[in-house]
Design a protein with these regions (language model features):
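N-terminal glycine-rich phosphate-binding loop and ensuing alpha1 helix
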Residues: 2-66, 75, 131
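A short, conserved beta-strand element in the Rossmann-like catalytic core
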Residues: 14, 124-126
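Conserved small/polar residues in nucleotide/adenosyl-binding loops
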Residues: 151-156
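Residue-level signal for inorganic ion chemistry
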Residues: 34, 108, 122
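Short catalytic-loop micro-motif centered on adjacent basic/acidic residues
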Residues: 48-52, 120, 147-150
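Short beta-strand-to-loop acidic/aromatic patch adjacent to the donor-nucleotide binding site
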Residues: 115-122
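Conserved donor-nucleotide/metal-binding helix-loop-beta segment in metal-dependent transferases, i.e.
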Residues: 130-150
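Short phosphate-binding loop-to-helix
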Residues: 69-114
Length: 156
């Protein structure tokens, strides 16, 4: 079976939050939300993780998350740099911020070379979500098949 990679979008600016919310503890024991996602991902079968981060947050991110996870996963880092754009595309003069999710995933070219799932570093998904997407990807033999896990929300 081809390796299945979990790609984690962790380069968010944190401007509304006021800091790196990816590494902010959410309980008295000091767990961060990504701890729960990675635990559930490991239980589902993921063993390869790619963190998409900003280059300037690498040291703090590795200390808080990456180094701990290397005992469970093969961990890679991709930088969402403004100069890493698809061929023929240039950033407008004066632009300092990277683009969003599409740009982040384009930066994975050459690092992710098979089936993969994508999550946000600061969202909670639960074990079922990871199991369902992993099982789908593991069973898939048709490269033209894709999946998106969606949740229904109760009406307000």
């Amino acid at each position: 079976m081809e390796k299945i990679t979990l790609v984690i979008l962790a380069a968010g600016m944190g401007s509304r939050f006021g800091g790196l919310k990816q590494i902010e503890p959410i309980d008295p024991e000091g767990h961060i939300i990504i701890d729960f996602s990675l635990f559930d991902a490991w239980r589902a079968g993921f063993r390869d993780v790619v963190f998409i981060i900003k280059r300037e947050m690498e040291e703090e991110f590795r200390e808080c998350i990456g180094d701990r996870m290397e005992q469970y996963f093969h961990v890679s880092y991709v930088y969402q740099d403004l100069d890493r754009l698809p061929e023929g595309i240039e950033a407008p003069e004066g632009r300092t911020k990277p683009w969003g999710t599409g740009h982040a995933l384009a930066c994975c070219k050459g690092v992710v070379n098979g089936p993969f799932a994508v999550i946000n570093a600061d969202d909670f998904y639960g074990h079922t979500a990871f199991s369902e997407i992993y099982d789908f990807l593991a069973a898939q033999t048709d490269e033209s098949k894709y999946a998106c896990l969606l949740y229904t929300s109760p009406s307000p």
